[in-house]
Every structure is written in C-alpha cells, then in structure tokens.
Amino acid sequence: MGMFCNQCEQAAKGVGCEIMGVCGKNPEVAALQDLMLYGLKGLAIYADKARELGARDEAIDLFMIEGLFTTVTNVDFDPVSLAGKLRTCYDMKEKAKSLYETAYREKNGGHAPAIAAGPAAWVIASDLEGLVKQGLEHGINTHHTDADVRSAIEILIYGLKGMAAYADHAYILGKKDEEVFAFFHKAMAATADPAKGLMDFVGLSMECGKLNIKVMGMLNEGHVDHYGHPVPTKVPTGTRRNKGILVSGHDLRMLEELLKQTAGKGIDIYTHGEMLPAHGYPGLKQKYPHLYGNFGGAWQDQAKEFPLFPGAIIFNTNCIQRPADSYKDRLFSWGQVGWPGVKHISGWDFSEVINKALECPELADAPEKEILTGFGHNAVLGVADKVIEGVKAGAIKHFFLIGGCDGAKPGRNYYTELAEKVPQDCVILTLACGKYRFNKLEFGDIGGIPRLLDIGQCNDAYSALQIALALANAFNCGVNDLPLSMILSWYEQKAVVILLSLLHLGIRNIKIGPSLPAFVTPNVLNFLVENFNLGPITTVEADLKAALGQ
C-alpha cells in the first residue's frame, strides 16, 4: 500500500495525494506520520484503560498532544525527527501499558487481560526503513472498511489534531485540563475499536468540538494572563534599518522569549502569517519596542517573500514549506516543526538565531502602510453599546465573519472579492491567515467602529464566539437569529476542529471553501447539510444575496 493523504484542502484532484503531497510531504514522511497515528492509538488504548482505574501520567498525556500536533499539515517533514518521535511514542505506549497493568493489579489482583493484536500490540521497527514499512501498512484507508465510517473517523482524528495544536500552545502557557487529556485518549482509542459505528464517531466529533471551545478558552486565558487583553493596534508592514528576525507560526510564548533575548541587541523582530496578532498584546508590543512590524502575508507566499527578508527566520509551528537555498541557511525550526537540513532549536535558547541575525545584512528603511489588529472580544465588547446602538438604528445591517486558513488555490480570490463587495452598512469580522486576502484594503468605519475587525489568530475563533454570544444575549435571541453570516476558508486540521466547535453550538448556514474536504463522503456531507445546512461557497453575488436575505 502506497502513500495516500487527504487531510488538507489541497488534496490532489480533490481526492488525495498519492505520489507526493501538495504540501511537500513525500511518501516516506507520510508513512511515518501514519505510523505515528497508529502508535498513538495504541498509547490511547492503554492510557484510557488506566484512567478508568484511576491511574494517569502527565508525560503520557502531553505526548499524545505533541504526537498529534506533529502530524498536522506543514509541521514536521523531517524523517529523522519523526523517527525519534516514533521511538518516544513506543516508549510512551509501553509506559501506558505498565500504568494500566499496575493499576489493574492493585484494584483487581492478578494480571490484566492481554491485548494481543492491533495498535496496542505494536512493536516498533529497529530502523527508519522498517518504520516506513510499518507506516505503509497502517494508512488512513485501513481505518475502517466502510467508507462512511472511515470518513467519520477521519473527521474525528483531524479534529483531535487541531485541538492538540491549541492544547499544546495552552500547555506551554501553563494551562492544562484533566477532562481534555482524558478525551484525547478516549477518542483515539475509539478509532481503533471495530465495535464503534458511524453515529459513535459523529457523537465523538461533536464532543471534540465542545471540548475545543474549552481548549481555545484556556489558550485565550493563557495569552491574557501573560500579555493582557489585545487592544486595537496599528502594525507597520514595511521595514526599518536594523538587523532583523522574522517569526512565523502561532506560538506567542516562544516569541516572548525571543524578544527577551534580543532586547538591546540592535535586532528588530517581525511577525509573519499568524503571528501578526501578537502586536495587539500590550505585554508584547508595549513591553518590547523592538517588536516592530509584520513582514509578508500568509504562509503560502513564503517562497516569494522569505528571499526578500535578509535576516534570520524561525518557524515555531506550521506552516513551513520546502525552503529555497536562498534562505535555507538562515532558517530555523522550533517546537514540533521540522524540515530536513533546517537547524532545529530545542528548548528556549535562541542564541544561534540571534547570532545568525547579527551576521546577516540590515533591513532597509522601507516604510509601507499600517494595518490594524487587536480586536479581540474584550476590545469589541468594550464598545458593545455602540455596536448594539448601530444595529438598532439601522446603521449596521449585518455582520460577516470572513476568515480562516489561506492557501494557494486560485479560487481563494473569492474571499477578496467577497470582502470588497460586502455593503458599506455591514461589519466584517476576520481571523486567521485568510485575512491577508483583504486586510490591506480600506474599509472605513460605521460611527467610529472600523468595518474590518481583525479578531486575531485561528484559535481566536473563541473571541468571535464570545462576540456572537454577547450580541445574541443583548438582542435576546440565538446566534442563528443574529444578522451574522459565517463564510469561512479552510486548509488544515485546526479549521476542522473550529468547524466542529461551531456545529456543537448548533450554528447553522455556515459556508466553507474554496472546496469541500476530500475526506467527507457524500453520505456524511448529506448528514451535515440536513442537520446544519452546511454548504460550499458558490459565487460572491449569490452568497451575498443569500446572507442578506435578498
């Protein structure tokens, strides 16, 4: 069995990647990531059984999160790195097995029932070639023989991957939760249970969406505890004469540590992609004046943009792509990120990155326009009275949430055109890197409220939900009754879990694009349409008319 991967929006031919991943993933890496999922299922089976007996181990819990995060699109492409993580996965599975057996013996006496087959019985291969061979035996098409059940399993697993990314960020900020840890194990163990059926996995996916709201809330709390509530902030998109380091990814804690270590060294720090919202946090922007600006746009343009940045560049999460030789020697990875030949920084010492930046040429004085960020729920709800007054007076007719992941497909210019054609009496909320499709355009304001409100990163969907729930409360109605339309773009698994969170809340009439997930079968799609009226984007004109009830 060869490579097959369909987890992202760019799945080849709308079906799946079988020769080489559009993301850059080769068959070797795909096999190692498939084996990671298989190993994590084995770990989960034992950890779940141990938990039922009152035994748990935080190291096992944390590895489940890190292991899932590793397999998110555009995170780790390094076979050597993945092989090392697989060895840790096996060790953690065996540790969970011992934990279960000990807990069983202490409670019941005697030996625990042995599990002789499946992922719990996995024995790791001794070398990289053997690991790849094992991975090829456990691809996603082996998850279930029934296509619809397999589709439901994939939705759950991709939701778990997305939630794992957020849980990892939250953990780094000191936020963790026993219910969340337990669910990861329960859900992953369920994917290996042949007795589970379609509706079991639908239910688990809804539970995943529910818990993801909790995880996003934990991450929001971690950010606010460390850096304060975001405030509306103008961010330069040009450069100034100084040495520079460009930070791409999502992790604010890593950015903070880099800011500490570069203070007073004549180095400016620039954000890229999903790091842009960092400028809205007072504990970062106001505390560290060398956090200067945002360079470039969304992740898919890095091959064009990074050669133009003369300093050091570091990724702390996805989305890394194959680096060009023109900047590969200035590129670093951190956390779960990996690419063959790219220097990986373990821990919190960024001296290698700093030294590389000091060796590199200075950036030029090249001022460009400023863009606004920092409209988290605290900032928006701080002017809720104006917003409510604007709606009641008819000055604000409708809200559009236009955001999500960006990507390389030509059809994504739909979101630019949509934002441009939203009527002047409507407000646009945006988040994640999809905002780069239109965040340099001028939208003006309504009664002093900007028509474009950048809420933040993809995980700040939590803020968007708080805004929607507060408005619903103010107007004494449900979220579905608000003059609010959600037209979302997706690319990877964090978008999947955010969608699950929205569906858990019963939010209907969401449109997603530019294409529907390849892993959703027609029958599963029909279920989503019938129960949630979830649908694909069509044309800008038709979707606007539908949203505005015209």
From Swiss-Prot:
It catalyses: A + NH4(+) + H2O = hydroxylamine + AH2 + H(+). Hybrid [4Fe-2O-2S] cluster binds at residues 250, 274, 319, 405, 433, 458, 492, 494. The modification Cysteine persulfide is found at residue 405. Keywords: 4Fe-4S, Cytoplasm, Iron, Iron-sulfur, Metal-binding, Oxidoreductase. Pfam families: Prismane. InterPro entries: HCP/CODH (IPR004137), Hydroxylam_reduct (IPR010048), Prismane-like_a/b-sand (IPR016099), Prismane-like_sf (IPR011254), Prismane_a-bundle (IPR016100). It is found in: Cytoplasm. It is an enzyme of class 1 (oxidoreductase). Binds 1 [4Fe-4S] cluster. [4Fe-4S] cluster binds at residues 5, 8, 17, 23. Its EC number is 1.7.99.1. One of its GO terms (biological process) is response to hydrogen peroxide. Its cofactor is [4Fe-4S] cluster; hybrid [4Fe-2O-2S] cluster. Its main location: cytoplasm. One of its GO terms (molecular function) is hydroxylamine reductase activity. GO terms for cellular component: cytoplasm. It comes from the Bacteria. Catalyzes the reduction of hydroxylamine to form NH(3) and H(2)O. Belongs to the HCP family. This is Hydroxylamine reductase.
